[in-house]
């Protein structure tokens, strides 16, 4: 094969240092709200996998298209060697293992919504984008970073989607990788969607459920399409955010 496209190398390969600690742990997530110090974030084994794949007969290049957790790439541990391995991995990933587009999943720009998702703040996506752009410039590459976003997630309102449109426009994105929230069994988000309450805090959580509510949120992904402009402007007026009209479409 001239090229090997695979998901062999996402951070899902990372494991815990001491499983005995994990058995006693009551945290629902190893990486949220902060990366657990027991999580082994050394990226050297992952680099070894990449090198082994590239050394296979007939393999010219291996590409990682998605599955990258940029919050782990930005994480600073107490071990300098681990931090060095993360920097080496980040450069090698971007310089040698992207086929032109790297998909990542910030999922939203609202930190309030991201908190319900148990995802890092959107500012971390901005940090990773700067690193991605810098390495591309240094390597003489013109690759694209493709973000994935969700509308109608529990906790998300139309105003959040309107602000998402403004923020992603400012970053020069015309969004393509988008999805409407789909309830999935045994997740915090689905429990909040079904009950109307956050299962940990018991605070009320709004969820868009009707077709009208869902479309009102989804349309903001496509602010750049002429056919969506009138509906978006009308919606911004309805929710009292006329200040965002100029930010999306300029002075009238």
What are these regions (language model features)?
Residues 8, 99, 239:
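Short glycine-rich loop/turn motifs that provide flexible caps or phosphate-binding loops at active sites
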Residues 2, 78-79, 118, 129, ...:
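Short alpha-helical interface elements
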Residues 19-181:
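Conserved AdoMet/S-adenosylmethionine-binding subsite of the radical SAM
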Residues 1-9, 14:
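Single conserved hydrophobic/aromatic residue that forms the stacking wall/gate
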Residues 4, 90, 95, 110-114, ...:
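Generic secondary-structure boundary/loop-capping signal
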Residues 102, 106-108, 144-252:
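Flexible, glycine-rich loop/tail regions that form catalytic "lids" or insertion modules at the edges
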